[in-house]
């Protein structure tokens, strides 16, 4: 999936995460994380974001995430939404997304 514009999903409320996806001129994914629980869960948060991007077929993007204690399912949902918005995709492949949980 090609990232065409900057897009945001989520909020800065407690138990949520704000994910911003930006286009990148170079191949690869960069994740910049800000979290009060980064020492305990930073590696897991990055892993969820990176795996979600991989499933979506994103090859080049810069991601900024501001975490406020979000669960993995919330991180995944916010990442999916931000990527679809950034790629200007209006149709979700729910069967494909659901198959990730198998």
Curated annotation (Swiss-Prot):
Q: Does the keyword Plastid apply?
A: no
Keywords linked to the UniProt accession: Cytoplasm, Phosphoprotein
Subcellular localization = Cytoplasm
Q: What GO cellular component term, any one, is given?
A: cytoplasm
Q: Look up keyword tRNA processing and say if it applies.
A: no
**What family does this chain come from, according to its entry?**
Belongs to the CitD family.
Role noted for this protein: Covalent carrier of the coenzyme of citrate lyase.
Protein known as: Citrate lyase acyl carrier protein
